[in-house]
Amino acid sequence: MNFETVIGLEVHVELNTNSKIFSPTSAHFGNDQNANTNVIDWSFPGVLPVLNKGVVDAGIKAALALNMDIHKKMHFDRKNYFYPDNPKAYQISQFDEPIGYNGWIEVKLEDGTTKKIGIERAHLEEDAGKNTHGTDGYSYVDLNRQGVPLIEIVSEADMRSPEEAYAYLTALKEVIQYAGISDVKMEEGSMRVDANISLRPYGQEKFGTKTELKNLNSFSNVRKGLEYEVQRQAEILRSGGQIRQETRRYDEANKATILMRVKEGAADYRYFPEPDLPLFEISDEWIEEMRTELPEFPKERRARYVSDLGLSDYDASQLTANKVTSDFFEKAVALGGDAKQVSNWLQGEVAQFLNAEGKTLEQIELTPENLVEMIAIIEDGTISSKIAKKVFVHLAKNGGGAREYVEKAGMVQISDPAILIPIIHQVFADNEAAVADFKSGKRNADKAFTGFLMKATKGQANPQVALKLLAQELAKLKEN
């Protein structure tokens, strides 16, 4: 029997506000343990939450970017549970009326086709703290993350393969990053994914029993975990077994999912309206103000890069996959850089350098200005493409002007015939055996002179000019 895969994803995204959702403490990642806390985060008796307007701004932008309807009557709810990293014993979230609902996003699949994936809801909530377990036998609670604003985006169960889930996450990350509401860095926990997967016989409308997957710390692992689950569940069903409702984690080392706990039924969090936060309304004017702050999104940029700049679909997709890269490209082209040349450098040498150094484009000294200047001095013959690679590394590490560095470092190509011709004659004088071979008609004897000339000029001879002059002088040599 063949089965249809049914997948839904729950994605938690940390919003990049300066302060937390209900307290004025910093929401920045990476500070010392419990440095970003105050009495609200610690839930001292008598403290009251104060809603950060910037969080609602970000929620509205997310809803608009994901084609969602917006609940204009806003309120928060208490989600009750106890855990050491949650000192209040409840989480302030949204239950029956999320900020956004009934949305969708279009994803591009590997075969070039597109599919629209529904988004059930997007709700605002506070993050919990973090427990760490020391080698000394003690467990420690860090509340830096407590109260960091989150938006949880819950998809419809519209995905029918791990590939579609991967494409959905890729598209979602792009949209959230372009909207400017999160850096969506999975390695820092600012984007976290839980997956729900079930199988059902083809033609059956009723969903099968679902399994929840956690510990999915990369899009690649989401895909691998789902692929493993498809195989595991299909084998159980074909052998006459039943799928249990359970939570599993993906074990990257063993490339398998591991049981965490069996879920007997849905958890009862006893939601009720948050009494310490008043109801408020999101006006049409507020929504339109947020709409005007949204940028051009990846889909529109890709289309423009192809139609206006003449890039291929592949190049346009690669450039727009990351907003930082796309913005860099936009500025470089606006400065007069050739779109194809800038694209080639960003996807080639720049990408290789970033991978080797383990850095992002923002963390190096390369700027649109000095990249465009470097491309210009390649085009005008000041430096060769080979030398340009060395110049690029210097610019990436040290910044500064490309032309200024080339001139100071003595890297300018020699293009003047008045300089090159005497060097060619000296090459002939220094290599009498090669000259004799050439004059006697020995096959490929002329090729050796190219290497001699480049060596004599320490690689600084303009190849096009030098080869033309060399051919000219060799012809004269043969006549004599």
Curated annotation (Swiss-Prot):
Catalytic activity: L-glutamyl-tRNA(Gln) + L-glutamine + ATP + H2O = L-glutaminyl-tRNA(Gln) + L-glutamate + ADP + phosphate + H(+); L-aspartyl-tRNA(Asn) + L-glutamine + ATP + H2O = L-asparaginyl-tRNA(Asn) + L-glutamate + ADP + phosphate + 2 H(+)
UniProt KW keywords: ATP-binding, Ligase, Nucleotide-binding, Protein biosynthesis
InterPro entries: Asn/Gln-tRNA_amidoTrfase_suB/E, Asn/Gln-tRNA_Trfase_suB/E_cat, Asn/Gln_amidotransferase, Asn/Gln_tRNA_amidoTrase-B-like, GatB, GatB_C_1, GatB_Yqey_C_2, Gln-tRNA_amidoTrfase_suB_CS
Enzyme Commission code(s) on record: 6.3.5.-
GO molecular function: asparaginyl-tRNA synthase (glutamine-hydrolyzing) activity; ATP binding; glutaminyl-tRNA synthase (glutamine-hydrolyzing) activity
Leading EC class: ligase
Name of one Pfam family that matches: GatB_Yqey
SMART domains: GatB_Yqey
Bilayer-spanning residue ranges: none
Gene Ontology process terms (BP): glutaminyl-tRNAGln biosynthesis via transamidation; translation
Similarity annotation: Belongs to the GatB/GatE family. GatB subfamily.
Known function: Allows the formation of correctly charged Asn-tRNA(Asn) or Gln-tRNA(Gln) through the transamidation of misacylated Asp-tRNA(Asn) or Glu-tRNA(Gln) in organisms which lack either or both of asparaginyl-tRNA or glutaminyl-tRNA synthetases. The reaction takes place in the presence of glutamine and ATP through an activated phospho-Asp-tRNA(Asn) or phospho-Glu-tRNA(Gln).
Subunit note: Heterotrimer of A, B and C subunits.
Name under which the protein is recorded: Aspartyl/glutamyl-tRNA(Asn/Gln) amidotransferase subunit B
Name of the encoding gene: gatB
